[in-house]
């Protein structure tokens, strides 16, 4: 939810799970990936929210931008170890997680916000396919789903439109 609707515990948990978890996972995986290199690949989960800061999801977007930046940096940093680092960037994945509330002080499901915005849900199977393609492909970031692709185009070619749409 919006930054000011999150209490400190919720904000800390979001950062801990979405960014610190990725950092800790990367650090733990590195020795194993290095031992099986070349051909090793660390796959991170960023988000379409890492393409353009999403109003109402400011802290979530910030953590996913951090994952995107970490992915790019580690891909170069670990090149000498024979480890490739990439990410998938899904938009809204059609899971039970979207049935949950926006935050602790709301009972409004996240799904309602996505539907109201006219955005599409991506089936879980498409995310699995994209993960396979990411690990076996050459792109550093793999967009997943129609909403992610639309967001990438709009963020690149129409950032003013993105700001107006968010209001």
Where are these regions (language model features)?
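Substrate-binding pocket helix/loop in short-chain dehydrogenase/reductase
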Residues: 2-3, 7-15
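A short helix-coil junction within the Rossmann-fold of NAD(P)-dependent oxidoreductases
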Residues: 28-39
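SDR active-site lid
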Residues: 80-146
């Amino acid at each position: 939810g919006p930054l000011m609707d999150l209490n400190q515990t919720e904000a800390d948990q979001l950062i801990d799970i979405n960014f610190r978890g990725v950092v800790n996972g990367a650090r733990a995986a590195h020795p194993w990936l290095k031992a099986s290199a070349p051909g090793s690949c660390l796959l991170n989960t960023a988000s379409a929210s890492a393409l353009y800061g999403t109003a109402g999801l400011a802290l979530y977007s910030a953590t996913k931008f951090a994952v995107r930046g970490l992915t790019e940096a580690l891909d170069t940093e670990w090149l000498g170890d024979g480890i490739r680092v990439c990410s998938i960037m899904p938009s809204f994945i059609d899971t039970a997680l979207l049935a949950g509330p926006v935050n602790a002080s709301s009972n409004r499901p996240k799904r309602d916000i996505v539907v109201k915005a006219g955005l599409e849900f991506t089936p879980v199977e498409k995310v699995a396919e994209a993960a396979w393609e990411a690990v076996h492909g050459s792109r550093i970031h793999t967009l997943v789903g129609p909403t992610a692709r639309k967001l990438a185009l709009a963020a690149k070619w129409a950032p003013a439109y993105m700001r107006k749409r968010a209001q």
